[in-house]
């Protein structure tokens, strides 16, 4: 359904305000592409302004709501992020206002750390089960994306496809984040173009 092969990646409500999330939705809709919720859940402003909205399921589960899964146009399971492969994140307490805290069911004004691993599965076999669970929740109506940080793209692409993903999202190290240490941002991971070739090789072999 998308008009261009470029989408807006997930940026959390909390890191961005409601107006910014709405603006991203309007911009994506004007260009015929999708935007993504990010950590912290879905806002009504974002859903209302976005023609195509991808709901991210992250290890933290902050703001996770099954009803919002059904309102989304696709679901993206975040296994990793290119700017911090293998690492979690943190949202500073100064950004945790009453609404953000309420959506995340955490205290207002306190730094909030995000885990790097999902609490309810540990490997590719469990990922397949999680994909089936999400399909059941959404009545098999939503495509399932798997987002991986570009660290070992050949193997991760293979595992995601075999687990039943409809789309593999390959996130390179240049994606950027304000929620991790500089050593991750500057020195860990692979640029998107370099990782893309390995991912394509994996897809060709699977065919």
Where are these regions (language model features)?
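Glycine-rich phosphate/ribose-binding loops and adjacent secondary-structure elements
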Residues: 118-207
């Amino acid at each position: 359904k998308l008009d261009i092969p470029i989408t807006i990646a997930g940026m959390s409500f909390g890191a961005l305000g409601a107006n910014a999330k709405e603006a991203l939705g309007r911009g994506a809709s004007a260009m015929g592409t999708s935007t993504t919720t990010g950590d912290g859940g879905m806002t009504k402003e974002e859903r209302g302004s976005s023609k195509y909205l991808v709901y991210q399921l992250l290890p933290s589960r902050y703001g996770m709501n099954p009803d919002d899964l059904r309102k989304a146009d696709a679901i993206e399971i975040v296994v990793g992020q290119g700017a911090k492969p293998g690492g979690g994140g943190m949202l500073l307490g100064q950004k945790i206002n009453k609404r953000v805290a309420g959506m995340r069911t955490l205290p207002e004004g306190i730094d909030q750390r995000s885990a790097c691993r999902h609490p309810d599965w540990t490997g590719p076999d469990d990922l397949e089960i999680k994909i089936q669970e999400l399909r059941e929740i959404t009545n098999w109506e939503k495509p399932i994306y798997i987002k991986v940080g570009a660290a070992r793209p050949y193997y991760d692409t293979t595992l995601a496809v075999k687990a039943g993903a409809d789309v593999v999202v390959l996130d390179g190290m240049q994606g950027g984040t304000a929620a991790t240490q500089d050593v991750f941002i500057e020195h860990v991971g692979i640029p998107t173009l370099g990782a893309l070739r390995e991912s394509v090789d994996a897809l060709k072999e699977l065919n």
